Design a protein with these regions (language model features):
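A short, active-site helix/loop in glycosyltransferases that binds the activated sugar's phosphate group
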Residues: 141-184, 191-193
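Glycosyltransferase donor-sugar binding loop
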Residues: 212, 238-252
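Nucleotide-activated donor-binding/catalytic signature segment of Leloir-type glycosyltransferases, i.e.
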Residues: 252-281, 286
Length: 379
């Protein structure tokens, strides 16, 4: 049994990707502690979840996003975690996403710890979000990307959350890394079973479109309300949104303005845990998971966790076409696809998925077994 220190730059309350990888290692007999950065200091500093200890660092309140205060907060978190782990080194350090990778690199250098890097996202793309024309931000993003790739090469095992499917045409994060001389294994962020509660394939007078997850941009919700407006009044769905994030206030303000104008009911709430997801999705008929493709991580293979989680409850998801998430969605019959910006297509596809049910058949078991084998070989 090995002691594993996982590091993540959010409060892990919850972070499905982090907790699934932690549970996987714990179920194989390893002792896992998640070192999480609770920027808003709103979660317990220490708790045990499914045999995994989550240790949250409260070092003052800090923002999310790409602001200077965010970077200062991350530096303070990294400094504190390094001190903690150097005082009592684990057998392995496991870094989730590039904003924690410097911690693992330093621990590997100073103590010789094996380093696992799990890439769920392309960190440098966040710098240009909302500022696609900024020359300065583009320059900074390239600098960050170069630094991240240099650090990733120092990892002993690299895991990504997406990769091209067999006979597919769209690349994933694994393929993004390959031209840079980095080999990675894919472990997609899938639930390990279908829930007992499944959406029923039946005609209902009222129906609901839901978005359950991080709220990072307003554009998808502007597009959603435009699509709903395109539907006949009697066919318009209620809207349910749950989750926190950098744009949650702006999105709430937008929906509070648009819902009365469209004549639809609105249900809004903030962060939720795994049990909360089960409750929230009970009345959702279609999950909405569309994103601006100008975000680099969308074009380069991001797969929305909510698509797999919704499917485990029988709920279809609407995602972007012309990228990996759309290809996976169609290949596994998990919902519908529409082109970003095509309001008519989005409206039509939402309506088409209204009474459908889906079945998640792939739980990523083979990927997980391959990962455990590689992890234990590393140790």
């Amino acid at each position: 049994m090995a002691s594993v220190a996982m590091v993540v730059s959010n409060a892990c309350s919850p972070d499905p990707r982090v907790m699934r990888s932690a549970r996987l290692l714990a179920s194989s007999g390893h002792q896992v502690t998640v070192h999480a950065f609770d920027r808003q200091q709103g979660s317990p500093m220490s708790e045990i979840i499914d045999g995994v200890r989550v240790m949250r660092y409260h070092i003052g309140t800090h923002t999310y996003g790409s602001q200077i205060s965010t970077l200062l907060g991350l530096r303070a978190f990294a400094k504190t975690v390094k001190k903690t782990l150097l005082t009592n080194p684990p057998d392995c350090v496991y870094c989730h996403d590039a904003d924690t990778l410097s911690i693992g690199v330093e621990l590997k250098k100073k103590v010789g710890l094996p380093l696992v890097f799990d890439m769920h996202d392309l960190q440098h793309t966040w710098l240009v979000m909302g500022h696609p024309g900024s020359i300065l931000r583009a320059f900074l993003a390239r600098r960050v990307e170069k630094r991240n790739l240099k650090n990733i090469r120092k990892a002993d095992l690299v895991v990504t959350s997406s990769g091209a499917i067999d006979n597919g045409v769209h690349a994933g994060f694994r393929e993004y890394l390959q031209p840079h001389g980095i080999e990675a294994m894919v472990v997609e962020n899938r639930p390990n079973r279908c829930d007992d509660h499944q959406k029923q394939n039946e005609t209902k007078e009222d129906w609901t479109v839901g978005y359950l997850g991080r709220v990072r941009e307003i554009e998808p919700f502007q597009l959603l309300t435009q699509a709903i407006e395109h539907l006949p009044v009697e066919s318009r769905p209620s809207i349910k949104i749950a989750g926190d994030g950098t744009s949650v206030d702006a999105v709430h303000e937008h929906l509070l303005s648009e819902a009365p104008r469209l004549g639809v009911d609105l249900n809004m709430s903030l962060a939720f845990d795994t049990d909360g997801f089960s409750e929230l999705i009970n009345d959702v008929d279609v999950m909405y998971a569309m994103y601006n493709p100008n975000r680099g991580n969308i074009r380069q293979g991001a797969l929305p966790v909510k698509m797999f989680d919704a499917a485990s409850f029988g709920v279809p998801t609407l995602v972007n076409s012309d990228c990996l998430m759309g290809e996976v969605c169609k290949n596994e019959h998990l919902g519908g696809v529409a082109q970003w910006g095509n309001v008519e297509s989005i409206a039509s596809e939402l309506l088409a998925q209204r009474e459908k049910t889906v079945t998640l058949l792939n739980f990523g078991t083979k990927q997980q077994e391959t990962f455990i084998e590689a992890f234990e070989h590393l140790l």
